[in-house]
């Protein structure tokens, strides 16, 4: 069983990542491909980024500086002095739910072995891969050597990595907790796995529907639940009960598992 999450645009650059698992920190597996993309990004002025990414002037200035500061080579690897593990750098609703800062060593190692974080710049990351701050959403139409967008750039590479990481998995099930924008980067027909997509619905005025803020946090919570309980197969996820959610069989099918939360528990 292997989980996929989207990254976050908001980053936590202040809190220090725990050092008791520093021996598990690693370099991104597709970093040489990241270099090719960063070469393109470094050539762009703030005004170019503002137009490309539809961001404010302040954000374009910030990310232009991040791009210029970004550096990786065989002689200049990411370290805890110039980078931070992805699972601790990414912030926002999903990562509030995942809550890696409060995990013990064994739980963080489980997450590292069972979770891939899709990324516009890094392809797919382990949570304990060092990365430097960036902004590049998967849906960005950044022309590159492989095509007009990042889906053309990453598709095959990301899919190969996911298949490799799932090779030793007992049940060959991919739990897709990523957004549509990011999961679109995966070539589904080339995956050697069954795909299950959890859906989180909250009750509002007697109706159950996906509420983005709650659903994002629930995605992180589901990975946390699997890690806390050291789950070994997908079927065990049906017992997921954090934050008041429960599996709803009548609203589920083989490919989409629906978890609901009643209004009284929100």
Swiss-Prot record:
GO BP terms: response to hydroperoxide
InterPro entries (alphabetical): YaaA
Pfam family membership, one: H2O2_YaaD
Cellular component GO terms held in the UniProt record: cytosol
Family listed: Belongs to the UPF0246 family.
HAMAP family: UPF0246 (MF_00652)
PANTHER family named among the record's database cross-references: PEROXIDE STRESS RESISTANCE PROTEIN YAAA (PTHR30283:SF4), PEROXIDE STRESS RESPONSE PROTEIN YAAA (PTHR30283)
Protein name: UPF0246 protein Pcryo_0542
């Amino acid at each position: 069983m292997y989980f996929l999450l989207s990254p976050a645009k908001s980053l936590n650059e202040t809190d220090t990542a725990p050092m008791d698992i520093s021996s598990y920190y690693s370099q991104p597996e597709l970093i040489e491909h990241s270099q090719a993309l960063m070469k393109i990004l470094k050539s762009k002025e703030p005004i170019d980024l503002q137009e490309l990414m539809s961001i404010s002037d302040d954000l374009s200035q910030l990310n232009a500086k991040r791009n210029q500061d970004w550096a990786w080579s065989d002689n200049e690897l990411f370290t805890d002095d110039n980078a931070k593990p992805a699972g601790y750098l990414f912030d926002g609703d999903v990562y509030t739910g995942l809550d890696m800062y409060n995990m013990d060593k064994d739980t963080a190692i489980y997450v590292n072995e069972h979770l891939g974080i899709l990324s516009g710049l890094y392809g797919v990351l382990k949570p304990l891969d060092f990365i430097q701050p960036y902004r590049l959403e998967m849906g960005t139409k950044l022309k590159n050597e492989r095509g007009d967008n990042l889906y053309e750039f990453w598709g095959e590479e990301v899919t190969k990595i996911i298949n490799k990481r799932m090779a030793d998995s007992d049940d060959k099930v991919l739990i897709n907790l990523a957004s549509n924008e990011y999961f679109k980067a995966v070539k589904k027909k080339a995956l050697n796995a069954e795909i299950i997509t959890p859906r989180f619905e909250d009750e509002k005025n007697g109706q159950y529907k996906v509420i983005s803020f709650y659903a994002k946090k629930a995605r992180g919570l589901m990975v946390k639940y699997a890690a806390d309980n050291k789950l070994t197969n997908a079927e065990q996820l049906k017992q997921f009960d954090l934050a008041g959610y429960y599996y709803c069989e009548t609203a589920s099918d083989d490919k989409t598992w629906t978890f609901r939360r009643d209004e009284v528990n929100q």
